[in-house]
């Protein structure tokens, strides 16, 4: 359905923006929404810990997940990136789970009826592929994680959880972090694990890290200047933030950027590394040593590396270390995204943003 077929504007998240907000540039909106992330996460944690309806829904989905079959987290774009954190955490807890691209799943899967639980993750609730999946659900349990209570998906699905990020007019930032957090919380419920203490610890680190990393953004932009290509590399929960980070850089700035898993980059693309190449490598969690080794090999081939880790390291001409406070697994999927977010802002401030703010939902095409 197009905007012209509606009698009123389809405002993002169903909320009309203020006139002051409508006058802001994309770069200003993007920075504002990046800096709103800590408060949005706090709002989500408070609701998922204290709201009886949300707690009841989490318990309901936990029970439904006990059925035979894998758990599927289904999304597109930034929402797919959020799915990766939840699926990785479930797999680490010995529960079969997969992050699935909705467009691929819609057209090429004949096994969706075998899932114990399929969680549809969507910010808008209006993407054509996700709407179709909600209209024609599999025989297994279907649930929704969505940021728009006025959406088509929200009206079609009975079991649903809110993302609680508020309207988002720039590139996916706070919706990615909130949706990732919600996926992790649901995974913890399914695994029978407490989540609040680890989440609150991460949030404290996230807030201070955001300020520190964003203060370093010009240093990162200067380090990357002239790169023909930027790759973002992660493993486990941080693989989702690697995909999201590359999307953010490329969509907002036009700078060529691509994501890779650590193993995927090691076995092939590393052969292409030279002085025109920059890698942002997340050396975090249980596979941190593999990330450090990969960074050293990239530097040895003449490439430049922004190495994101929980240790202090001396910088060099081709190595820019960025230290993150250690957080409990799998919450590095949230803290690590701050580095590509900050770099994106610096590039946009220097060269301008390639996108315009989006205040209304447009035509949703496959």
Residue ranges and their predicted role:
Residues 2-30, 38-39, 43, 289, ...:
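Phosphate-moiety recognition in structured ligand-binding domains
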Residues 21, 26, 50, 145, ...:
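Short, functionally important structural connectors and interaction interfaces within domains
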Residues 32-69, 159-280, 288, 351-366:
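Active-site phosphate/pyrophosphate-binding segments
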Residues 24, 28, 33-37, 55-58, ...:
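Short, positively charged patches
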Residues 4-18, 64, 104, 156-160, ...:
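Membrane-targeting and insertion segments and their boundary/processing signals
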Residues 66-203, 207-208, 235, 270-271, ...:
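Glycine-rich phosphate-binding loops that contact phosphosugars or nucleotide phosphates
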């Amino acid at each position: 359905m197009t905007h012209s077929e509606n009698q009123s504007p389809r405002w993002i998240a169903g909320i009309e923006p203020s006139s002051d907000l409508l006058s802001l540039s994309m770069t200003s909106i993007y920075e504002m929404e990046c800096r709103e992330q800590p408060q949005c996460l706090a709002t989500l944690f408070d609701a998922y810990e204290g709201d009886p309806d949300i707690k009841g829904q989490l318990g309901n989905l936990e029970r439904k997940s006990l059925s035979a079959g894998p758990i599927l987290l289904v999304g597109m774009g930034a929402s797919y990136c959020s799915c990766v954190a939840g699926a990785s955490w479930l797999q680490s807890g010995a529960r079969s789970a997969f992050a699935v691209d909705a467009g691929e799943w819609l057209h090429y899967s004949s096994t969706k009826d075998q899932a114990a639980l399929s969680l549809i993750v969507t910010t808008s609730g209006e993407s054509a592929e996700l709407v179709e999946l909600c209209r024609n659900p599999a025989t297994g349990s279907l649930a929704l994680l969505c940021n728009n209570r006025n959406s088509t998906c929200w009206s079609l699905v009975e079991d649903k959880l809110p993302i609680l990020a508020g309207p988002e007019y720039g590139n996916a930032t706070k919706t990615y972090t909130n949706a990732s957090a919600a996926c992790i919380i649901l995974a913890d419920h399914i695994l029978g694990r407490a989540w609040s203490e680890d989440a609150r610890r991460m949030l404290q680190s996230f807030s201070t890290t955001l300020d520190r990393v964003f203060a370093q953004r010009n240093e990162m932009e200067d380090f990357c200047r002239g790169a023909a290509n930027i790759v973002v590399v992660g493993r486990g929960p941080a693989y989702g933030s690697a995909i999201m980070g590359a999307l953010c850089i490329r969509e907002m700035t036009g700078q060529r950027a691509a994501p890779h898993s650590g193993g995927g980059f090691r076995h092939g693309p590393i052969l292409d590394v030279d002085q025109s190449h920059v890698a942002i490598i997340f050396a975090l969690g249980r596979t941190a040593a593999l990330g450090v080794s990969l960074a050293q090999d990239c530097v040895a081939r003449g490439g430049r590396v922004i190495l994101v880790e929980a240790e202090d390291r001396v910088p060099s001409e081709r190595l820019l270390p960025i230290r993150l406070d250690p957080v409990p697994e799998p919450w590095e999927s949230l803290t690590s995204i701050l580095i590509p977010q900050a770099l994106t802002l610096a590039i946009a401030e220097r060269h301008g943003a390639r996108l315009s703010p989006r205040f209304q939902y447009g035509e949703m095409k496959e």
